[in-house]
């Protein structure tokens, strides 16, 4: 069975969800593709934010020969095969997943072909490339950061997924609950939706089904609601006011909600 996240993989940049600072009218990646020009790029950001989706859309819109390798799984010989194919057939795009794990041997064989333009790479990573990728590779790539998706973006993606699930019954509140579990990760949200759908005997996905599959109900069903921001504000005010008990209380609430990023930002 093909996963819902793979079924929904876009073939056009206009179908990419979120990342409006990179894709859309007048945005840098969309402009490059519109002009039929691509430089080697590294897309980095948290899981499920659209790195693979953007790479997929790029190669389909440019209609160029491409291959996909994983820097961990694929061996040096696999990279050699791609290079030989490019030598015979001409320009090629090489999508490299987990590019931050690419060892020196693989980097060394690629560098001359990046220099010549025979191979253009699209590197995908969850790690900050400024810290994790060899400068020799990094200096030959344009680096784009992807942001966690908003709750609204996740809901858009879930609704696209729902259209692919036959005879599903689900209400808007349940969709929001699934989105709230995702932490900006659309793939995670789609996987949860799919598990809930197939684990329900009548194809009815309710909040109770979601909770039984994924555990406790999140404290905030929607991180765009006022309660979430009121808690963040109260946490910061209690720190500024040196109210230890209140700060610890609101810290515990945010920890329970699972939002570590916002805690780090407020405490740094």
Stretches found by the model and what they are:
Residues 104-139:
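Conserved catalytic/switch belt of AAA+ P-loop NTPases
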Residues 1-35:
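A short, basic N-terminal segment
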Residues 2, 31-69, 84-85, 111-116:
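Walker A/P-loop
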Residues 64, 134-148:
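A short helix-turn-beta junction within AAA+ P-loop NTPase domains corresponding to the substrate/partner-engaging
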Residues 70-72, 142-155:
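Conserved AAA+ ATPase "SRH/arginine-finger" region at the nucleotide-binding site
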Residues 176-181, 187-201, 209-215, 233-237, ...:
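C-terminal helical "lid" of AAA+/P-loop NTPase domains
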Residues 140, 156-166, 195-199:
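Conserved AAA+ ATPase "sensor/coupling" helix adjacent to the nucleotide-binding pocket
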């Amino acid at each position: 069975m093909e996963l819902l996240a793979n079924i929904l993989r876009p073939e056009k940049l206009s179908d990419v969800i979120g990342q409006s600072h990179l894709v859309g009218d007048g945005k840098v990646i969309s402009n490059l593709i519109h002009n039929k020009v691509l430089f080697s790029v590294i897309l980095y950001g948290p899981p499920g934010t659209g790195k693979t989706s953007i790479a997929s859309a790029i190669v389909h819109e440019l209609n160029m020969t491409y291959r996909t390798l994983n820097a961990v799984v694929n061996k040096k010989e696999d990279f050699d095969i791609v290079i030989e194919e490019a030598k015979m057939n001409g320009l090629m795009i090489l999508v490299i997943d987990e590019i931050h794990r690419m060892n020196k041997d693989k980097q060394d064989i690629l560098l001359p072909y990046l220099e010549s333009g025979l191979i253009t790479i699209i590197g995908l990573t969850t790690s900050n490339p400024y810290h994790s990728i060899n400068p020799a590779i990094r200096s030959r790539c344009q680096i784009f950061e992807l942001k966690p998706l908003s709750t609204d973006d996740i809901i858009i993606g879930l609704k696209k997924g729902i259209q692919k699930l036959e005879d599903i019954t689900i209400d808007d509140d349940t969709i929001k609950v699934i989105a709230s579990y995702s932490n900006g990760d659309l793939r995670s949200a789609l996987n949860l939706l799919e598990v809930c759908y197939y684990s329900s005997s009548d194809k009815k996905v309710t909040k109770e089904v979601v909770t039984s599959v994924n555990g406790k109900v999140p404290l905030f069903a929607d991180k765009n609601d006022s309660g979430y921001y009121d808690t963040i504000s109260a946490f910061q005010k209690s720190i500024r006011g040196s109210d230890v008990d209140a700060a610890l209380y609101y810290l515990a609430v945010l920890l329970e909600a699972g939002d570590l990023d916002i805690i780090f930002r407020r405490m740094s």
